[in-house]
Amino acid sequence: MSKFFTKGRIALLIIFSVLIIDQIIKIWIKTHMYWHESIRITDWFYIYFTENSGMAFGMEIFAKLFLTLFRIAAVTAIGWFLHRFVKLGLKTGFIICVSLVFTGALGNIIDSVFYGILFNESTHSQIASFMPEGGGYAPWLYGKVVDMFYFPIIDTNWPEWMPFVGGEHFIFFSPIFNFADAAISCGIIALLLFYGKDFNDAYHAAIKKS
């Protein structure tokens, strides 16, 4: 059993498993929900469909293209390091963490690269279709990342007597994210908590052996 589950195979298993789960969730959300439609699971957990163009401060075409190309370059670099780490025989837990980060980044790149041509626009009145006759909502590299997990664990108003924020609405945790984002976060947090000292050594070993 141990010979079958080599570090390389474990990495591949994580990559394919996370990627498949991530894309199944995103495609289902995209083809079954209206934009900004919400499904209540509990008071603190909602499925809330939104899309993230990845553009900051409203910057359009060139910013989006640059961001997608940057993501592709980043995931290529992470993939190269992951390959080197496996070849170097580093700790299995370390390989798992890097695999999670790599796969999460790759999952969001798929959205950015392909979703614009594979789906039409999601709106408040239209659910997107896969491979629509009229074409997709954007060209290659200009797709939007699908997000859906929303955890408003604390949803309340600040007490009126508090300075500056009194009476204002407060939500924790407000970001809406996807399965790929969760994989990235879990991988990075685990790396920092358990492999902070190993990462620097692994990086230099990978560079030296290349």
Language model segments and positions:
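Alpha-helical transmembrane bundles and membrane-interface segments of multipass inner-membrane proteins
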Residues: 1-210
